[in-house]
Amino acid sequence: MKSKLKLHGFNNLTKTLSFNIYDICYAETPEDLQAYVQYIDEEYDAERLTQILTDVVDIIGANILNIARQDYDPQGASVTILISEQPVTPTDSQIEESPGPLPDTILAHLDKSHITVHTYPEIHPVDGIATFRVDIDVSTCGVISPLKALNYLIHQFDSDIVTVDYRVRGFTRDIEGRKHFIDHEINSIQNYLSDDTREAYQMTDVNVYQENLFHTKMLLKDFELENYLFGDATRNLSAEQREQVTERLRHEMLEIFYARNMPH
């Protein structure tokens, strides 16, 4: 075990985890598309999001100071939680490069600054495709990385595509006055994901180590069409229609994953 870094004063490093989660579906009729948006809007309303973020606060061991939440018309929701700092002696499991807990195994000890979430349901005007995007930011100041919340959050949403960014900014000084621009080892965000998550997703990294900037994109490997169909009308799709819908959905997912429009 490595000896702990002795600091002069408080740890001033800011660690920010930002990620976007996308859920994709297909509906045959305009009415079913609107029903999907309504379903998502109710399933992930401000109250549900508040509970999810409260669980994140538990995972990172923070104290809630204030919660601001809002449901929007016609759809969407947002929640911001301010969290307080207090002196903490982190355990080895909190600072090592390893996966955080799953939804059914939440345990925690950390303390930090703010968490926000916003939701964005949207539908394609002609192709029957609907997407639901969740943007989450977890920003902490101090010794423990917000990456410990990543594993839990991916399991809380139906995540077809996930884009994750992690950065460390600022510096802290040791007792000899030497600056430290990062206080933990990290080679890849993937090391904070559980084995089942790594096996389920195709992943690619773009990391700028000298800038303490890490980026991982994730695309679900297994594609079961039944998991992407919404509404009663989709039950009557012919084999040819099912093949066409599969192509549309995969094309949509690849465009989101690569962040560019692609030819059909």
Curated annotation (Swiss-Prot):
Taxonomy of the source species: Bacteria, Pseudomonadati, Pseudomonadota, Gammaproteobacteria, Pseudomonadales
Family assignment from sequence similarity: Belongs to the prokaryotic AdoMetDC family. Type 2 subfamily.
Keywords per UniProt: Autocatalytic cleavage, Decarboxylase, Lyase, Polyamine biosynthesis, Pyruvate, S-adenosyl-L-methionine, Schiff base, Spermidine biosynthesis, Zymogen
Site (Cleavage (non-hydrolytic)): K112, S113
GO annotation, cellular component aspect: cytosol
Organism of this sequence: Pseudomonas paraeruginosa (strain DSM 24068 / PA7)
Active site: S113 (schiff-base intermediate with substrate), H118 (proton acceptor), C141 (proton donor)
GO biological process: spermidine biosynthetic process
PTM note: Is synthesized initially as an inactive proenzyme. Formation of the active enzyme involves a self-maturation process in which the active site pyruvoyl group is generated from an internal serine residue via an autocatalytic post-translational modification. Two non-identical subunits are generated from the proenzyme in this reaction, and the pyruvate is formed at the N-terminus of the alpha chain, which is derived from the carboxyl end of the proenzyme.
Cofactor annotation remark: Binds 1 pyruvoyl group covalently per subunit.
Catalysed reaction, written as an equation: S-adenosyl-L-methionine + H(+) = S-adenosyl 3-(methylsulfanyl)propylamine + CO2
Name under which the protein is recorded: S-adenosylmethionine decarboxylase proenzyme
InterPro entries assigned to the protein according to its UniProt record, in alphabetical order: AdoMetDC_fam_prok (IPR003826), S-AdoMet_deCO2ase_bac (IPR009165), S-AdoMet_deCO2ase_core (IPR016067)
Metabolic or biological pathway: Amine and polyamine biosynthesis; S-adenosylmethioninamine biosynthesis; S-adenosylmethioninamine from S-adenosyl-L-methionine: step 1/1
PANTHER family in alphabetical order: S-ADENOSYLMETHIONINE DECARBOXYLASE PROENZYME
One annotated GO molecular function: adenosylmethionine decarboxylase activity
Domain of life of the source: Bacteria
EC number: 4.1.1.50
Pyruvic acid (Ser) PTM sites in chain numbering: S113
